[in-house]
Amino acid sequence: AVQGPAVRHQRSDLRTMDDMTPLLELAGITKRFPGVLANDDVHLEVAPGEIHALLGENGAGKSTLMNILYGLYRPDEGEVRLNGEPSGIESPADAIEAGVGMIHQHFMLVPTLTVAENVALGLAGNGVLLDTSGVAERVGELSSRYGLSVDPEAYVWQLAVGERQRVEIVKALYRDCRLLVLDEPTAVLTPIEVEELFVTLRTMATDGVGLIFITHKLGEVLALADRITVMRDGRVTGETVPSATSKGELANMMVGRPVQLAPDRPMVEVGAVRLAIDGLRVDGDRGTEAVKECGLEVRAGEIVGIAGVSGNGQRELAEAVVGLRSVTAGRVAIDGVDVTGMHPSRVRAAGLAYVPEERMRDGVVAEFSVAENLILVDHDRPPFCRRGLLRLGAIADHCRDLVERFMVKTPTLDTPAGNLSGGNIQKLILARELSSEPGVLLASQPTRGVDIGAAEYIHRRLIEERGRGAAVLVISEDLDEVLALSDRIAVMSEGRILAVMDRDEATIQRIGLLMAGSEAVA
């Protein structure tokens, strides 16, 4: 059976928090941009030694608020206080000097420098040449204290994603950080690395460091946080503690309505193999082999999910299957037809639909209208084209129907696709791809960066395709998503599929070991 987070770590003692001077006070923060009220009278406090989760959908105002704290923006109204005093923060340098650190979702490290050099970068006294004397020893002390295993002499480009995150934390601690903001810190980690990170954060909290934990993973919030603040439309809509709430209540606070977090998965009779991948080998962008002897079958009426940390060959596998990347060996077949190496249009004609990982780069033409994007791959065929002329009435009827059925929020059909929200762009892509009722659907990172409401809708549509008899292959770095959707789960590491298991056999622990490259549990 699927299992949740393994351990709920001991919380730091916050019984005297009300008697403390808050480490951080955001008092009545308001920030306006042209046409947008990004923050509206926001109040937030963080105590010393507290892990404070900040939740909210895209556009809720979280990033603006944290950028104000870090000195990237100035508030139009309100005040930032540290230890009861006005912070005086006007730049990131001021924030660092004041003991505020921020670890962005995309790490801010120089790959060609060593760990010690990255830690020393920007420190007072460093000129053109970095002085790393004494840095390695201090890095070793911090690593030992907080369970952050890093080699000071290793080059950053040699490190795995989880190790790079540890470097970012060490870098903040080296600068005597007393308040650390972490933006989606578990997005690129294996379950084992998530548990290790939680231990580190709890140790930091024990030492009095305040932590602001920004994430969309509600289970992690309940497992880790001492307090939770929820934002929506630039305002704080609620503050609570894990013992007094649930995933459903938090999601409701985020979107303003009840949300179905676990999609219904009706029983479906599984049919014949519709997508067959056999012995596939594919080179990556740098010429090295990214996909190594991959084999996988997806049958009618099932969803197979591929789990794995980013950069382990998932993108190259998807692009090879749909015809966007050359194959060096192996075979791809759709309904028994060999489509290996075919042009994407021929693969599509064989019955495959594709929801790409990079929706803005590969899924839509941002400057084209909603209608133009909806007929992008079929504009030269009936009923949209006759004798070389577009049939505008047929196009409009078709597009209106898709926009309505797939709940795409757009002012008009003529609105440029790039003007839509991420969730609506993803719905637009789904509408186009599913309108042909494909036999095989490959969806890569289907809900990355979309709101809870859009993710709920996308999950429902994928399950409906399964019910229709399509073979659905979902590639996702979100393990919760893979577990919620899949009938079978494949785990990919270093270009190989290490194991394929039924959902009833899947545990977070087993998948986590496989994601980390352990074949012993395969």
Question: What is the role of each PLM region?
Answer:
Residues 16-522:
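Glycine-rich phosphate-binding loops of nucleotide-dependent enzymes
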